[in-house]
Amino acid sequence: MALKLVYGVFTLALLGISSVNADCSLKIPESVENEKTPVIMVRKSLKTFEYDLFQPTGEVTNFPERTELLLACTGAQNYFKNGEESVTLMCHNNEFDDGQGNGLDLFTCVKTPTAELRKTKERCSLGDLYVYDVVFRISEEELVGPVYDICYNEYSQKPAYSRNIINGAAVNYRVPESETDLTVSLAKDFTTRDVNNYFKLENQKQRFQGYTIDGKPLVDDKNFFAPGQLAPDTSMITPADKLSTYDYANIVPQYKTVYDGNVWRVENITRDLAVNRQAKFEVYTGGYERLTALHNGKEEEIFLSAKKYVHEIPKYIYKFVVDKENDAGIVFFTLNNPHVKNVKGTEFCKNQCEEANVLDSNFKDWTQGYTFCCTWNNVKDYVRALPQDIEINNLLKFN
């Protein structure tokens, strides 16, 4: 099923929103830059009380007269200063207001709105797992979204992949990123505190004492495991959307030097291409295979905790970028291992980086995560967790 993040375009078309002769507008980041900005939703039509998440069409999104916005402070104990959890604004005489002269800028929540993960009936990973939507709850019965979704393994308590949209027309106007603590919303056997402890360097040194890769300690002061986002906050525009990516269900352990190195570069060049083309890219990000290390003379698969199959550490981080409009795509694989110097055998497809005009010399630097490029058809039989019904006939090129 196609990710439902086209909601903004659908809503704007339904309401007849265009860039000319509009009566009201929202400008980003100005309209959403306060970290306590409420979730903004657009009423689908005046004939229904259904809403879609606001999806900007650029730096400025225009709306016609009588467009209705719903602002909501989602999450526990969250509300406006007047005690209400939601408020409706109507476009009238070139301004959005609540009928009493109060505009969007006067409504901030007591804290950043939070999202929740909702299990759907949609299957993923060859039908073995379920898709979880990341949504905002605006009432006991009503959910709005998703912001992105996750194919989640509730048995090993980890994501198979996360899927998000890069909105090339608007993402460069996003609210700046800020470091945020992780939360744990789906796991049954560990808490947020447990996860935070797993990512403490001193705990990792103790956990992996005696583990080596190519004769080097698995973990040291420079190379250690960090919580690496799959759907990145850098692809999200509003504070609430960004906060939703800091859930452990959207995280896999990645070497910090790799996550801050070539994983970061892949995210950046993909986002830049979407901006340059003013395109919407559908992006799947996940881990592939398990990292191994030598321990007591034996090669072992690696897990952050001593409990096997929980908090597994992937050997590769992949990012599958789909440009549906042009029937094009590319799959990046980054080796989650800054220790290995001999990368022979690392690639399992014909490397298409040069053909795709991805010419960053850093991709060959193993200390930042050796990175190569594949066509979808070359690797779909390897990465079986991804939807096998996706058909891509062209290589996505970065020029």
From Swiss-Prot:
Q: Which GO terms describe its molecular function?
A: DNA nuclease activity; double-stranded DNA binding; double-stranded RNA binding; metal ion binding; RNA endonuclease activity; single-stranded DNA binding; single-stranded DNA endodeoxyribonuclease activity
Set out the biological process GO terms recorded for this chain's protein.
apoptotic DNA fragmentation
Tissues expressing this chain = Saliva (at protein level).
Among SMART domains, the record links this protein to: Endonuclease_NS (SM00892)
Any single GO CC term annotated in Swiss-Prot or TrEMBL for this entry: extracellular region
In terms of Gene3D superfamilies, this protein maps to: Extracellular Endonuclease, subunit A
Q: Which residues form the signal peptide?
A: 1-22
Q: Which UniProt keywords apply?
A: Endonuclease, Glycoprotein, Hydrolase, Nuclease, Secreted, Signal
**Residues bearing attached sugar chains per UniProt:** 268
The answer on whether this UniProt entry bears the keyword Glycosyltransferase reads: no
What InterPro entries does the record tag this protein with? DNA/RNA_non-sp_Endonuclease_sf, Endo_G_ENPP1-like_dom, His-Me_finger_sf, Non-specific_endonuclease
Q: Which Pfam families match?
A: Endonuclease_NS
Role description: Binds double-stranded DNA (dsDNA) with high affinity. Binds double-stranded RNA. Binds single-stranded DNA with lower affinity and with a preference for purine-rich sequences. Shows residual nuclease activity for dsDNA. May facilitate blood meal intake by lowering the local viscosity created by the release of host DNA.
The record's PANTHER family line, in alphabetical order, gives:
ENDONUCLEASE RELATED (PTHR13966), ENDONUCLEASE-RELATED (PTHR13966:SF17)
Task: Tell me its family.
Answer: Belongs to the DNA/RNA non-specific endonuclease family.
Q: What is this protein called?
A: Salivary protein Tsal1
Provide the gene name from the record. Tsal1
